[in-house]
């Protein structure tokens, strides 16, 4: 617009400055005869007298033609001038536009250079932080190596002190042996000198007795030394035999040269008789004590049972507790301790982490350590009622009587007359409608099969005198089974345990004599439906094909049937759960690294098979993982909480709390990755014997998650339903604390952005050192656990990826 206005002003100026043909004073005349150049204009001023003449001339035709030519000339000049002005204005516009573009490009280039400098500074800061982190890690590794070397030196010094003590004890034992031999030799010489010829025989017997006593003392000392060092014991035996032979030959070289061999034989025979006599007296004292507490018929049957059981082979794997008890009573205390120690060592030597630890062999089923059960969570989810949880703590109800000798429970043989037990709850005799001969025969066959009895808790002593054929359950819906009872085609062998949903017993198939485990579901409609759902899932898992060289590592269901309004599921037998294995062989110290590797590979194979079956287990924990007798194969059991992926419900109480994934607590959509999280928690517990996330509440669990794994992503928190229970509107974690004074729960902001705890320090404390090869494997285990416990379920490792992890490869 500015340019157009300038052009119009120029046009107006030109029009005002150009002469017109109507101007009477100025006339352009072209005179070719004059000396002026072409294009010059003469201005002629006419007088008033000549105006008339000129006006008359203008009226003539020739004058009109000259005026028209002059007008066309002026018009052409004006057109040229306008074109030039228009062209110059357009060129100036292009020049301005081009200058403006150049300035814009310069500004853009300057911004680009500024951004490049900013990126360069940012990269420099990042490199500086990375170098600082590397230096910090290097210092941490250096400190860890220094601590490891210090621990190794301390262990080496401890071993040297132990060797020093052992050598001093060996020297003391040798000196005591030599002193006893000298005293023995002098005493035997003096006794022979003072003996008369008629008391020769008595004197020889006395020397035999003296030598027997010294031999027993030496044998006892040798037993003590054997526990400390077997090699030194063998040397002591050799020296003792040489000294004894030389001294015997010296003492009797003049009279009886063959007597030393006779003395040794008589010593061994006397020692055997003494041990038998002590055992007989011990049994007699026990029987006298037992006779005071029990009626005479029970005593006679017990003694008969003991005589039968004393002839059985105690090394058999199927030997029940009663047989073991009588064999224990028939041994001396020192021999008993040695035998138990050797048997335990032969079983657990490959699975202990520390064979010299006293805690590794401590095991008590009644130990009330802190554990996590899903029963309270089932109550919160509405699956079970309050009285169902209380019913779990009640003892298993059977009609088997027991007695206790030296804190060992022994099943008594069946008696012709009913015996009243100490418990007040009356229980019927479910075999009362059968002939007594058949009942006695079945019990007799069971005793012969079981070796005379089974281990039964003393709390299950009941009164079998009640006869109610229409009532098979107790008040809580548990089936009141009886040892020896035949259910369908299976004969009950012994009780195993009871839970909220069922009672578990061991049994044998009557035709094939095959060992099985029967799960007897409680007589409740909801639990019956859960049992049917478990059967359906087990059938689906068993029908899913596996790889040719792999196993499913899931418990196999053999049969199922209904018996007296109870759904019964038959499984293959296994030894114990991994929870019991850790309590027995690795309490507070865990299992060996190789055992954890073997178990981890089998667990991921099981997860892979379960995922291929489109099933979520939703309750993986050491209690639901069983191991075989050889302790080299594990299987996942208890699919009562399992289901298909489309059946999953958003609830914060799914899975046992210590093994519960964060997406369950936050109310986020979950899938098969919750089982991977549970397996990661189990692996840490296998190696340490302790819980990785021992939270008391869901809020406490989230705090532990963030301390070990860092903060949650805001994207995940925004998609969760229960995020308001644990985070504020700014997505800051709110820690729940209990006010001890007001007894109220208050929420305190507890912002955690980075991990404050390390899983490697949880696996290996600072005061523990392991070999370098095991350290490499332990770092791989830590990496596998971290990938299994990633907070985001979409980034968590899958079972197939875990099977290719470095930790699962052999050493």
From Swiss-Prot:
Any idea what this protein is called? Serine/threonine-protein kinase prpf4B
Q: EC top class, in one word?
A: transferase
Q: Which Pfam families does the record cross-reference, listed alphabetically?
A: Pkinase
The UniProt record lists the EC number as 2.7.11.1
Q: Which domain of life is it from?
A: Eukaryota
Compositional bias (Polar residues): 203-215, 241-257, 293-302
* Residues that coordinate or bind ATP: 496-504, 519
Nucleus recorded as keyword: yes
Q: Where in the cell is it found?
A: Nucleus; Chromosome, Centromere, Kinetochore
């Amino acid at each position: 617009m500015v340019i157009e206005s300038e052009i119009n002003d120029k046009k107006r100026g030109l029009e005002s400055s150009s002469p017109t043909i109507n101007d009477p004073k100025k006339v352009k005349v072209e005179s070719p005869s004059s000396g002026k150049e072409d294009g010059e204009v003469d201005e002629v001023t006419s007088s008033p007298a000549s105006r008339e003449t000129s006006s008359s001339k203008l009226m003539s035709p020739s004058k009109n033609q000259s005026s028209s030519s002059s007008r066309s000339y002026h018009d052409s000049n004006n057109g040229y001038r306008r074109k030039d002005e228009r062209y110059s204005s357009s060129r100036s516009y292009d020049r301005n536009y081009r200058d403006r573009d150049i300035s814009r490009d310069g500004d853009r280039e300057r911004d680009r250079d500024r951004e490049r400098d900013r990126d360069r500074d940012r990269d420099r800061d990042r490199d500086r932080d990375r170098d600082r982190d590397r230096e910090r890690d290097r210092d941490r590794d250096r400190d860890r190596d220094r601590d490891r070397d210090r621990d190794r030196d301390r262990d080496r010094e401890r071993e040297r002190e132990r060797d020093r003590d052992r050598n001093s004890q060996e020297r003391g034992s040798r000196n005591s042996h030599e002193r006893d031999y000298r005293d023995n030799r002098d005493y035997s010489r003096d006794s022979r000198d003072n003996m008369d010829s008629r008391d020769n025989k008595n004197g020889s017997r006395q020397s035999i007795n003296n030598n027997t006593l010294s031999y027993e003392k030496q044998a006892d000392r040798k037993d003590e030394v054997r526990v400390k060092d077997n090699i030194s014991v063998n040397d002591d035996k050799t020296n003792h035999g040489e000294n004894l032979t030389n001294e015997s030959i010296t003492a009797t070289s003049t009279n009886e040269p063959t007597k030393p061999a006779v003395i040794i034989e008589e010593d061994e025979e006397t020692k055997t008789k003494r041990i038998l006599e002590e055992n007989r007296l011990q049994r007699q004292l026990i029987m006298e004590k037992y006779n005071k507490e029990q009626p005479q018929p029970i005593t006679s049957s017990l003694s008969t049972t003991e005589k039968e059981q004393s002839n059985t082979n105690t090394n058999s794997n199927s030997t029940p507790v009663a047989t073991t008890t009588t064999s224990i009573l028939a041994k001396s205390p020192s021999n008993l301790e040695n035998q138990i120690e050797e048997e335990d060592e032969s079983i657990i030597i490959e699975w202990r982490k520390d064979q010299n630890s006293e805690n590794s062999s401590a095991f008590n089923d009644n130990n009330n350590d802190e554990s996590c059960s899903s029963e309270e969570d089932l109550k919160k989810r509405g699956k079970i009622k309050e009285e169902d949880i209380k019913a779990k703590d009640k003892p298993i109800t059977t009609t088997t009587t027991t007695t206790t000798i030296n804190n060992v429970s022994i099943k008594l043989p069946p008696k012709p007359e009913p015996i009243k037990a100490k418990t007040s709850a009356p229980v019927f005799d479910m075999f009362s409608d059968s002939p007594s001969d058949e009942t006695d025969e079945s019990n007799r066959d069971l005793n012969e099969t079981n070796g005379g009895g089974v281990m039964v808790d003393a709390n299950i002593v009941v009164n079998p005198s009640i006869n109610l054929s229409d009532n098979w359950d107790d008040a809580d819906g548990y089936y009141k089974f009886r040892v020896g009872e035949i259910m369908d085609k299976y004969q009950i062998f012994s009780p195993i345990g009871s839970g909220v949903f069922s009672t578990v017993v061991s049994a044998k198939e009557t035709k094939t004599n095959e060992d099985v485990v029967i799960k007897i579901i409680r007589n409740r409609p909801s639990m019956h439906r859960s049992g049917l759902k478990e059967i359906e899932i087990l059938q689906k898992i068993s029908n899913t094909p596996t790889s040719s060289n792999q196993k499913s590592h899931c418990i196999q269901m053999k049969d199922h049937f209904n018996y007296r309004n109870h759904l019964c599921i038959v499984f293959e037998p296994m030894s114990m759960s991994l929870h019991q294995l850790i309590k027995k062989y690795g309490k507070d110290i865990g299992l060996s690294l190789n055992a954890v590797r073997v178990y981890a590979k089998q667990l991921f194979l099981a997860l892979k098979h379960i995922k291929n079956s489109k099933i979520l287990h939703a309750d993986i924990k050491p209690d639901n993982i069983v191991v075989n007798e050889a302790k080299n194969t594990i299987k996942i059991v208890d699919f009562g909480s399992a289901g298909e992926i489309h059946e999953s419900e958003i609830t914060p109480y799914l899975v046992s709390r210590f093994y519960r994934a964060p997406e369950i607590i936050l109310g986020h959509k979950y899938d098969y990755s919750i089982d991977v999280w549970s397996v990661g928690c189990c692996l840490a517990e296998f190696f340490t014997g302790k819980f990785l996330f021992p939270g008391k509440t869901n809020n406490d669990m989230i705090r532990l998650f963030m301390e070990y794994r860092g903060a949650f992503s805001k994207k995940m928190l925004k998609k969760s339903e229960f995020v308001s229970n644990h985070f504020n509107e700014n997505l800051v974690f709110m820690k729940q604390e209990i006010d001890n004074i007001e007894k109220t729960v208050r929420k305190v902001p507890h912002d955690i952005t980075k991990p404050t705890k390390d899983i490697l320090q949880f696996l290996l404390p600072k005061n523990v050192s392991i070999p370098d090869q095991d350290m490499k494997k332990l770092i791989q285990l830590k990496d596998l656990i971290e990938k299994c416990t990633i907070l985001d379920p979409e980034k968590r490792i899958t079972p197939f990826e875990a099977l290719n992890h470095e930790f699962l490869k052999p050493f």
